[in-house]
Amino acid sequence: MLANEDRFRIFTGNANPDLAREIAAYLGTTLGDAVINRFNNGEVQAMINESVRGKDVFIVQPTCGPNVNDNVMELLIMADAFKRASANHIIAVIPFYGYARQDRKARGREPITAS
C-alpha cells in the first residue's frame, strides 16, 4: 500500500476512467475499488469495495458527453455512498461542468441550471 492511500483515495465513475487513472498515477497512488453498474431500468448502483472511513475521497467525474444527466447522477450517487461509508471529506473533481452554459436567464420562466 502506498503512503498516500492512508490519507486519501481517488475514485472514478464511468465518464472518464482514463483521466482518473492518470491523475492517480501522477499523485503516486492507485484508483480506489468501486464499481458503478446500471440496473435494467437505467438506475445507477454504486458499490464501494474498500473502506474509506476517515479518508478524504476524490471522485473524478466529468459531467459532459452524450450522457450528461447520467454522469451527474453517477456523481451524486457515488458521493452519497462515500458519505454513508464515513469518508472524512468528499471532493468532486469535475474537469468539465455540464450545464455551465445555463448560467443566466435569457427568458422568463427559465431556470438557471448552473447555479
Where in this protein do the model-derived segments appear?
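PRPP-associated nucleotide enzymes
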Residues: 1-115
